[in-house]
A protein has these predicted regions:
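ATP-dependent small-molecule kinase phosphotransfer cores
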Residues: 1-11
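Hydrophobic positions in the central parallel beta-sheet of the AAA+
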Residues: 14-17, 77-79, 235
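Short, polar loop motifs at secondary-structure junctions
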Residues: 47-51, 122-127
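N-terminal glycine-rich phosphate-binding loop and ensuing alpha1 helix
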Residues: 75-125
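Conserved donor nucleotide-binding strand/loop of the catalytic core
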Residues: 132-146
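Conserved beta-loop-beta/alpha segment of the NTase-like Rossmann-fold superfamily
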Residues: 143-246
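Conserved alpha/beta core of the MobA/IspD/sugar-nucleotide pyrophosphorylase nucleotidyltransferase superfamily
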Residues: 243, 247-293
């Protein structure tokens, strides 16, 4: 099957359901796998066993290795929940949606990914109580500006973790599991040593073919969810932007940094336009609820 693929369809992806201990004893098979990796794109499941054969695959410079048991632990999630909801009339994060509050919905969405740490930043006592009930770490504050809230969240992440990458998640009220996981997976891909060694093109858009080395040659990528190239939230920043996150201009959030470094931004396609919606008024929430029925 491998030789037929290389002769007839080497440009397509060859899928291997498992490479493990048994394959380590067959030299001809190992040679075919090496030829396959040298000449075609491959998607393979590989066991965590340590053998000379498996280790040689995992150590290749052109292999992106993802540990599915620990895939997103290097990313921390910061839920920004300090808005005053002036146009809504009451705290919109306490409004009912799908038998939960909007804030509880955001917490549930954050569970779609096994983040290394999840943290909420809020000024509202009611949201602190929800965090305590849901076992979510929380910072209660009375700071006036968005940049203050970003600084509080990032500072806590840096203090309590080993330099985790930061995910500012304001605007995740309606994300699907697929979109959030894709955003995090592409962040890991674009900020991996594999991508840094193999990227050539300077495109900043991931919508067309986001696994085809189409960004500039470094691993300082900001990944941002978008729909039809219209950027939204959440946004994930690698650690090289921590100082900028800690020193944002008054009233600015993470989007300010993304706009400052457009060549470093990868737009990750959301599954549906509604995932990027924000709720400013009760009518907005009613319209969205009807749309999702």
């Amino acid at each position: 099957a491998i030789m037929k693929h290389l002769m007839t369809s080497a440009d397509s992806v060859f899928v291997i359901d498992e490479l493990g201990y048994l394959e380590s004893s067959c030299i001809p098979f190992q040679e075919n796998i090496k030829s396959l990796l040298d000449n075609s794109r491959v998607l393979a499941v590989i066991r965590k066993q340590s053998t000379e054969f498996l280790d040689s695959i995992k150590s290749r410079a052109d292999v992106l290795l993802i540990d599915i048991d620990n895939i997103f632990s290097s990313i921390s999630c910061i839920i920004m929940a300090s808005g005053m909801s002036k146009r809504f009339g009451t705290n919109k994060l306490l409004a009912s949606f799908n038998n939960n509050t909007l804030f509880e919905n955001a917490i549930n969405i954050s569970h779609f990914v096994s983040f290394g740490k999840t943290l909420a930043v809020t000024r509202h006592d009611e949201l602190v109580q929800i965090c305590e009930r849901e076992h979510i770490h929380c910072i209660k504050h009375n700071m006036p500006y968005r940049n203050d809230m970003v600084r509080l969240g990032v500072s806590r992440i840096l203090k309590e973790t080993n330099r985790h990458k930061s995910c500012c998640t304001q605007g995740i009220l309606f994300l699907t599991k697929t979109s959030l996981q894709l955003l995090c997976l592409l962040f890991i891909y674009y900020n991996s040593s594999y991508f840094a060694c193999n990227s050539t093109d300077k495109s900043s858009n991931a919508n067309n073919n986001y696994f085809n080395n189409n960004n500039i040659n470094n691993n300082n990528k900001i990944c941002r969810l978008a729909f039809n190239e219209n950027a939204g939230a959440p946004v994930i920043f690698p650690e090289c932007y921590y100082n900028e996150l800690l020193t944002l201009p008054q009233g600015k959030g993470g989007g300010f940094i993304a706009k400052k470094h457009p060549a470093q931004v990868v737009l990750v396609p959301a599954q549906d336009e509604y995932e990027l919606y924000d709720i400013d008024t009760p009518d907005d929430l009613i319209r969205l609820s009807r749309y999702l029925r």
